[in-house]
UniProtKB/Swiss-Prot annotation:
It comes from Sinorhizobium medicae (strain WSM419) (Ensifer medicae). One of its GO terms (cellular component) is cytosol. The enzymes which catalyze the reversible phosphorolysis of pyrimidine nucleosides are involved in the degradation of these compounds and in their utilization as carbon and energy sources, or in the rescue of pyrimidine bases for nucleotide synthesis. This is Thymidine phosphorylase. Pathway: Pyrimidine metabolism; dTMP biosynthesis via salvage pathway; dTMP from thymine: step 1/2.
């Protein structure tokens, strides 16, 4: 006989280990509505306090994956690979990575999310492109993945519906920051997409959700161990988020930055190092390259030949965007009416910045959400962000604020200027790839 929901909650509350059948039964009730919100909240709090073993977390992830539709790409006969980022500022890596990796052979069915807190969302960026459909029919999604090799869309109602319900409850019960629940939430959606391999970008620094290195490693290790335990070959790179990754933060501005990157104009930057590291990791995981050096060379060829840019343009068009978007982005991406420079406060070197607050500045401009139903102004944000260790003179622009009106842009520019520390000497170079976990 199935265990009553309250007995599952009691067992976990008291520190017991749940068996897969108990977890599966509870999650099935979450998906079909027989578990109440109060019971779901109590379960989440019990997990928050008592934690979960790796095997429990694998069972939770698989149960949430199986609560809805799971995709199968076997008929394509190509490796299926994806990447997930825990989020940061100016992190538009997915936009470039999907077409680069697809140009090398694997298929990349990327199911992405919206902005959360101070971080930007891949879907919000793509919606700055007129006509781009983030919720295509399953048939169109499969057709685009087959023809182009990649498609970036949003989560459908049929993928991991139990996670959608549990996350909404966690959001209002102070249980968002539970490593087992974060792990199962992220991975259930990714595993439902039918992946064979997954690479995780776990951010560390003052622009990430987890600023403590020990906590960051715990989350990264949990994600890697549980995903591998669930049968998906997975690795993680812990990457630096103590400054924006791209030189822009904001939706249309990051799409513009993506096109510049795919056109070969950002080689040698921190952004380039991250994109190439993840492309190499994904290609090796997919078995397309024998080792990472070969994978990076393949990715570089896809970039320099223009094939990755061509695939990005094809993906945009197949999903409803303009056919000539990559040739004429200025005709389609809206520009903010007010652009105001951010002046360096004094001579010296850019030594540090408050990255999270830079993300909040984009939200203040209207480029992100304070509430789930807020409308986003895709035009606004920060551009021309100078990297740390840059030598500047007093009054020299270190960024440009793109705002809906001049008063707003000037107010945000003054705020942004205070978020940078300028020192007499350049700070030590911080590695952009901090570590790798498998």
């Amino acid at each position: 006989m199935a265990m009553l929901p309250q007995e599952v909650i009691r067992k976990k509350r008291d520190g017991g280990r749940l068996v897969p059948a108990e977890i599966a039964g509870f999650i099935e009730g979450l998906a079909d509505g027989s578990i109440s919100e109060g019971q779901a909240a109590a379960f989440a709090m019990a997990v928050w306090f008592s934690g979960m073993s790796r095997d429990e977390c694998v069972a939770l992830t698989l149960a949430m994956r199986d609560s809805g539709e799971t995709l199968d790409w076997g008929e394509f006969g190509r490796p299926v690979v994806d990447k997930h980022s825990t989020g940061g500022v100016g992190d538009n890596v997915s936009l470039m990575l999907a077409p680069i990796v697809a140009a090398c052979g694997p298929v990349v069915p990327m199911i992405s999310g919206r902005g959360l807190g101070h971080t930007g969302g891949t879907l919000d960026k793509l919606e700055s492109i007129p006509g781009y459909n983030i919720q295509p029919s399953p048939e169109l999604f499969r057709r685009v993945v087959d023809e182009v090799g990649c498609a970036i869309i949003g989560q459908t109602a049929n993928l991991a519906p139990a996670d959608k319900r549990l996350y909404a409850i966690r959001d209002v019960t102070a249980t968002v920051d539970s490593v087992p629940l974060i792990t199962a939430s992220i991975l259930s959606k990714k595993l439902a997409a039918g992946l064979q391999s997954l690479v995780l970008d776990v951010k560390l620094g003052n622009g990430s959700f987890m600023t403590d290195p020990a906590e960051t490693e715990i989350l990264a290790r949990s994600l890697v161990e549980v995903a591998n335990g669930a049968g998906v070959r997975t690795s993680a790179l812990i990457t630096d988020m103590n400054e924006p990754l791209a030189d822009a933060a904001g939706n249309a501005l990051e799409v513009e930055n993506c096109l510049a990157y795919l056109s070969g104009k950002k080689a040698g930057t921190r952004l380039d190092r991250v994109v190439m590291a993840f492309a190499a990791e994904m290609l090796a995981a997919a078995g397309v390259s024998a080792h990472k050096a070969e994978g990076e060379a393949m990715a570089r060829r896809a970039l320099e030949s223009g094939e990755a840019l061509e695939r990005f343009g094809l993906m945009v068009h197949r999903l409803g965007g303009p056919a000539d978007f990559v040739e004429r982005p200025e005709a389609y991406l809206e520009r903010a009416p007010a652009i105001v420079p951010v002046a360096a406060a004094r001579d010296g070197y850019l030594a540090a910045c408050e990255t999270r607050e830079l993300g909040m500045a984009v939200i203040a401009l209207g480029g992100g959400r304070r509430r789930p139903d807020d409308r986003i102004d895709h035009r606004v944000g920060l551009a021309g962000l100078r990297p740390l260790r840059t030598k500047v003179e007093k009054g020299e622009p270190i960024a440009f604020v793109h705002g809906a009106d001049r008063d707003q842009a000037e107010a945000v520019a003054k705020r942004v200027a205070t978020l940078y520390a300028i020192a007499e000497e350049a700070p030590a170079q911080r590695p952009v790839i901090a570590s790798r976990l498998v």
